[in-house]
Amino acid sequence: MLSALAVLLAATPPGAREQTTVIMPEEPQQRQIHEDWGFAQAIIAGETIHVSGVVIGAPAEGASLQDAYDRGFARIGDILKRSGASWHDVVEIISYHTDVTTQMAPMIAVKHRYVKAPYPAWTAVEVSRLIPDRGITEIKVTAYIGGRKQSTTAP
């Protein structure tokens, strides 16, 4: 009976995460945070890249919201690059905002510098708070790197 169970377990295909590539931060302090909290910066599953939410903090003194968003979008761009993708491969953006009224215009201005047509799907949600508490916006993206053909827009 036990030998039959062992054969069944050995024949079981690996789980989905065992067939993925995990992208972790290069900076030791950030990597430790990800390991302590138990999450990847990004994960490549087949031809899809799932980037964990990147939290944009309140702008430093003398900086603008656009400056803060630019740092966040650049960080996402770096994660995409290390995952073998770029902003052109992004098919979905989900953003969480603590104040949609003041954050949307600067976010859109910066997004237009990084994200070009054909545009990905985008959902923006207002939330009461983010982790860490100094966070004002969190941006999560999904990229698709399969079938890298010339993109076209529908009429």
Where are these regions (language model features)?
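N-terminal presequence-like segments and the immediate start of the first folded domain
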Residues: L2-V91, H97-P155
